Regions:
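Histidine-centered active-site loop/cap adjacent to the catalytic His
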Residues: 3, 20-21, 387-411
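Short, intrinsically disordered terminal tails adjacent to the first/last structured region
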Residues: 1-20
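Extended hydrophobic/aromatic segments used for targeting, binding, or gating
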Residues: 192, 197, 202-207, 212, ...
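Membrane-embedded alpha-helical segments of integral membrane proteins
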Residues: 22-63
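Membrane/wall-proximal cationic-aromatic binding patches
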Residues: 96-194, 374-378, 384, 388, ...
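Interaction-surface signature
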Residues: 98-113, 117, 211-308
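Conserved, well-ordered alpha-helix/loop/beta-strand core segments that scaffold catalytic motifs
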Residues: 232-243, 297-377
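Internal/C-terminal transmembrane anchor helices
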Residues: 69-95
Length: 411
């Protein structure tokens, strides 16, 4: 009786071990990357930079757990995407504008202007240095006190009532208000001090304002109620970004006055601008998910991205400035309205800056270019600004600008 030996298939233990190894590797990579991502979101100063690098490394590590050149090529190329995004995130994190923090109650809502500083208050303003990829904000860029008078205007120096040569009004945004500076370092304050008290200065500028608040303050009688001595000069400190604000093409509105222009050129106010809804809300995302995504500088940039301005927006802005000049001239005959124009702070504003220069000249409004007043400002503005990450004018810039204003007035 012969015994037939049947060849049994090879034990599955070897095959199982061959499959278990890659599967275990891939599972380990996925789980460890997920845990690392959660820890980064919880504790890291720039979580999405590290999170993206983690997943780039995970995809490249997964190449050792798959067979075949095509799967490996796909994983390699997929890993490039988060790696590139990590580079963008790193750049934005280290160059992102850091907002100031104000003491409670410093700003209050206003139906006309949108927001105003509280009257008769001393408010503290602080600004942290930018965060790094390896550290949270280290120290502060500035820690200053803003003194507001009984009219809600930034503190002005004493003036000689018996030898008063005139009153000078200032309008504008944080550049004229004096962001990050002590009271006596602002442009209006320096004009008063350097004149020896012969000129009284009134600073109607406020952080975030633009031409629309200047017009609203004049049209609604806010300026008229404050000014009790005939002003001889009015200076509007302008920036190209004011065009975006006047057209409502910024992510924040804060109930700012909204002006529109009719087909016949008539300018009128039509309600107010309000804040744009957060990107997560617009996309219908869960608030918790939106909060986590907001830890990404890329996400914040997308949510805060300003629309492009058009030639119509520039015309609207120039019309607002012109109307402001006309109302001041009607209320204070003989007043001289002038513009101090800062150059573009962002390359995207370059064309707008040039059109504003041409527009002011075309309207016959005297304009002083900061790039001409502050020597070397265009090529190297470092000595005239607060820091590399904050281009607001420093005390030196305002002292030189004040000298320019007084020379213009003396002519």
């Amino acid at each position: 009786m012969s015994v037939v030996k049947t060849a049994l298939p090879a034990t599955r233990s070897g095959e199982s071990s061959q499959l278990t190894g890659p599967r275990f590797l891939l599972a380990s990579i996925f789980v460890s990357s997920l845990v690392a991502s959660l820890l980064f979101l919880k504790f890291a100063p720039a979580p999405f930079f590290w999170l993206l690098l983690t997943w780039a490394a995970a995809l490249w590590s997964a190449m050792f757990g798959v067979k075949g050149s095509w799967p490996r090529a796909i994983l390699f190329n997929l890993g490039i995407v988060p790696c590139l995004l990590a580079g963008i995130e790193a750049y934005l994190v280290t160059h992102e504008y850091t907002p100031s923090v104000f003491s409670d109650g410093f700003y209050v809502r206003d139906d006309i202007m949108g927001w105003v500083p509280a009257k008769g208050i001393k408010g503290r303003a602080t600004k942290a240095n930018p965060i790094g990829l390896l550290h949270h904000p280290a120290g502060t860029l500035f820690d200053v006190t803003y003194t507001m008078d009984s009219n809600g205007l930034r503190a002005a120096p004493p003036y000689n009532k018996d030898d008063l040569a005139g009153t000078v009004l200032f309008f504008g945004c944080s550049f004229a208000f004096g962001e990050g500076l002590n009271d006596d370092e602002t442009l209006p304050y320096q004009v008063g001090v350097q004149s020896g008290g012969r000129y009284r200065t009134l600073n109607f500028a406020v952080n975030g304002y633009g031409s629309e608040q200047m017009l609203a303050a004049i049209a609604h009688g806010i300026v008229g109620r404050v000014v009790d001595s005939t002003p001889r000069y009015a200076y509007y400190v302008a920036l190209p970004v004011h065009v975006w604000r006047a057209a409502g093409r910024v992510s924040w509105g804060l109930h700012a006055p909204r002006y529109v222009q009719a087909p016949d050129g008539t300018l009128y106010q039509e309600g107010n601008f309000e804040n744009r809804k957060p990107l997560a809300v617009r996309l219908g995302l869960n608030p918790h998910i939106g909060g986590q995504l907001n830890k990404s500088a890329i996400w914040r940039m997308l949510g805060m991205h300003d629309s492009h301005v058009t030639d119509d927006d520039i015309r609207l802005y120039l019309t607002i400035v012109r109307r402001s000049q006309e109302l001041l001239a009607a209320e204070y005959p003989g007043i001289q309205f002038r513009v101090i124009l800062y150059p573009y702070q962002d390359p995207a504003q370059r064309a707008t800056y040039q059109k504003l220069r041409e527009g002011f000249v075309r309207m016959g409004i005297p304009v002083g270019l900061v790039e001409d007043i502050l020597p070397g400002y265009i090529t190297d503005r470092s000595k005239f600004i607060l820091s590399a990450g904050d281009t607001h004018p420093n005390a030196l810039a305002n002292r030189l600008l004040a000298q320019y204003v007084l020379k213009q007035i003396a002519r």
